[in-house]
Amino acid sequence: VHGDHSNLVGELWNRFYGRVLVPAECAMEVAKAYDIPYGAIYPLYPGNTYYFDDFTLKVYPGAHDNRAFREGKFQRPSDPRSLYDGSEGFGISCPSNLGPLGSMYNFNYLIETKNNYRIDFSAGRDFEEHLQHVQKERPNLMLRHRIRSYTPEQYADMIEQMGAQLMLPLHHNNARASGEDLNEYMRKVNEILISRNCSGRTFNPEPYRWYQICTSILAE
């Protein structure tokens, strides 16, 4: 529920209504921060499966990236900035507990469509643990946090271990911080996968562009 992920949720709810799916421990603060009616909030708990009209959602525990530890930047309860950092820059009314809650409560999840297409979402530092949860799921598509410290070899390891057909990066906008060329990065990842005879591939999507993902039959 950090501001860079949740800042539009109030606007979207007021435009489309519906239910807001959110980690249960963060539900009250999300409702308060964005003035969303309590009845529209749908608290989620790890280990549960939720059935909707168009898809099934399986929720797993998650853990935020530990970049703050690597860079020596900590959010302590004693620091008054913890109620502002990560929120005020995105137009969220402060003080707010969205920043601290977003660091503590994280989910990974798997979506299965009515056509049995499986999409896995995993972010943060607990990829190895998440693999244990979904080892029998074999998702078609995985959305994986591209943590800036990952080498192409490490990123290739993840798609190979997951067994997915395609991997798309999450939070890859962080490459702007270092001026990194993600197209070149993904090219290296795919070259590594090819060298390992792994059929999985990754792709760097262009921001704000729609794509179709499909299974095709091509004549030789």
Predicted features and spans:
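Core dinuclear metal-dependent hydrolase active-site scaffold
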Residues: 44-134, 212-220
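Active-site environment of divalent metal-dependent phosphoester hydrolases
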Residues: 2-7, 27-30, 48-50, 66-67, ...
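Active-site neighborhood of phospho(di)ester-bond hydrolases with catalytic His/Asp-centered motifs
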Residues: 1-2, 20-24, 119-125, 141-147, ...
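Binuclear metal-ion centers of metallo-dependent hydrolases, dominated by the metallo-beta-lactamase
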Residues: 19, 33-51, 156-220
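Active-site metal-binding motif and surrounding structural segment of the metallo-beta-lactamase
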Residues: 1-34, 40-43, 135-143
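Glycine-rich loops and low-complexity Gly/Arg-rich segments
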Residues: 20-23, 45-48, 65-69, 81-86, ...
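Loop/turn elements at helix/coil->beta-strand transitions in domains of secreted/extracellular proteins
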Residues: 16-17, 115-117, 138-140, 163-165, ...
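A short acidic, amphipathic alpha-helical/loop segment
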Residues: 8-15, 130-134, 153-161
